[in-house]
UniProtKB/Swiss-Prot annotation:
<comment type="function">
    <text>Plays an important role in the regulation of cell proliferation and cell differentiation. Required for normal regulation of the hair growth cycle. Functions as an inhibitor of hair elongation by promoting progression from anagen, the growth phase of the hair follicle, into catagen the apoptosis-induced regression phase.</text>
</comment>
<comment type="similarity">
    <text>Belongs to the heparin-binding growth factors family.</text>
</comment>
<dbReference type="GO" id="GO:0005737">
    <property type="term" value="C:cytoplasm"/>
</dbReference>
<dbReference type="GO" id="GO:0010001">
    <property type="term" value="P:glial cell differentiation"/>
</dbReference>
<protein>
    <recommendedName>
        <fullName>Fibroblast growth factor 5</fullName>
    </recommendedName>
</protein>
<keyword id="KW-0964">Secreted</keyword>
<dbReference type="GO" id="GO:0043410">
    <property type="term" value="P:positive regulation of MAPK cascade"/>
</dbReference>
<dbReference type="GO" id="GO:0008083">
    <property type="term" value="F:growth factor activity"/>
</dbReference>
<feature type="compositionally biased region" description="Low complexity">
    <location>
        <begin position="38"/>
        <end position="72"/>
    </location>
</feature>
<feature type="region of interest" description="Disordered">
    <location>
        <begin position="23"/>
        <end position="81"/>
    </location>
</feature>
<keyword id="KW-0339">Growth factor</keyword>
<dbReference type="GO" id="GO:0023019">
    <property type="term" value="P:signal transduction involved in regulation of gene expression"/>
</dbReference>
<dbReference type="GO" id="GO:0008543">
    <property type="term" value="P:fibroblast growth factor receptor signaling pathway"/>
</dbReference>
<feature type="signal peptide">
    <location>
        <begin position="1"/>
        <end position="17"/>
    </location>
</feature>
<dbReference type="GO" id="GO:0005104">
    <property type="term" value="F:fibroblast growth factor receptor binding"/>
</dbReference>
<dbReference type="GO" id="GO:0005615">
    <property type="term" value="C:extracellular space"/>
</dbReference>
<dbReference type="GO" id="GO:0051781">
    <property type="term" value="P:positive regulation of cell division"/>
</dbReference>
Amino acid sequence: MSLSLLFLIFCSHLILSAPAQGEKRLTPEGQPAPPRNPGDSSGSRGRSSATFASSSASSPVAASPGSQGSGSEHSSFQWSPSGRRTGSLYCRVGIGFHLQIYPDGKVNGSHEASVLSILEIFAVSQGIVGIRGVFSNKFLAMSKKGKLHASAKFTDDCKFRERFQENSYNTYASAIHRTEKTGREWYVALNKRGKAKRGCSPRVKPQHVSTHFLPRFKQSEQPELSFTVTVPEKKKPPRPWKPKVPLSPSRRSPSPVKYRLKFRFG
């Protein structure tokens, strides 16, 4: 009885001591952690709120240079024409003429293409383009009287509305000038002699061939899609060496034998 009683007491002691050991918390160094104070949570909350306040206070200062930079970038932005196309405008009227812009402000057409007929068409806005002579460095313009001329500065008179016709030709009408009563647009046109016509003329209509221009732009050379493969040439095997045979001395041909004919009679 005494042994069994002692065994039961020992087991009960082990069972009671196990929960007490589990409640102890150990730090990474193996030492028991100090008890947590309820006031520490409030202290940590105070520190976090102070940190958030300092960061929020410093954020407007950091953001202000960025806002100033964006404003300076917006103010320094300059408009630049886009969609540049370099080529010539061919009018199908008469024998056919290329639109030319002269340095002195004259505008007409020439049957043969020249440096004066090299034009640069660039987009200003949706459907609105400008036309500049590459050689003369002047812009095609239409005055309030409908006369075509070249302008050194790009103004509203230099803006034209580009439209694509069903016959693959284009028409160019002034973006600001038109007939006030009827609202008819004024078009860029050439007559049969290659001279510029007034846009306000009642005969200048989008259906007439004098207003039809075919853009002839220089297409960029497309890269070749094919490629060549160089195969190393196979060297022919050397011919087998043949021993040189000594040439036999030439034999002299024997002298011809002469036969005498003998005639026997009777």
